[in-house]
Amino acid sequence: MEIHPDELARIKMLEETKVTSSLPGNIKPWNGHPVPVKKLDPAATLPTKANDTDAGYDLYALEDLEIGPVNQKLVKTGISMAIPKGYVGLIWPRSGLAYKHGLDVFAGVIDAGYRGDIGVILYNSKVNDHYKIKKGDRIAQILFQKIEDFDLVEVDNLDDSQRGVGGFGSSGS
């Protein structure tokens, strides 16, 4: 896996200076797992965090589009990632878009082996309003989560549990 020379220079600078609070623009300290990100389109915007304590990285729309009332669209970001093995990228809504505009994000799982365009399925819940997305708008966020690997084993019977087969509201309201 090859890291872009500009990113290597940024990492080196941060390690040498230990500067974190006075970095310009969207340059953040490199203190986590490196996740290589590739622009599939020169117009794409790389994911960013507004604050160091934010859980997710904002994802940006690659192009202008309009979502009709009670409709959904797949929005391209123009980027791909090499998420490390043992992790997954989860696509989540941005709370402001949901609250202010009724725009939701359908669940997305970006597996470590996926190398294509990270697309976001946006849903407009408004009955009468169209929603316009502009190129460069923040449309969702990606959160990285460590995952465990399991081996599924077929059995004839499962151990009993207190809940049993109760589901879909069986635990009360």
Which residues fall in each region the model found?
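DUTPase catalytic domain/fold
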Residues: 1-173
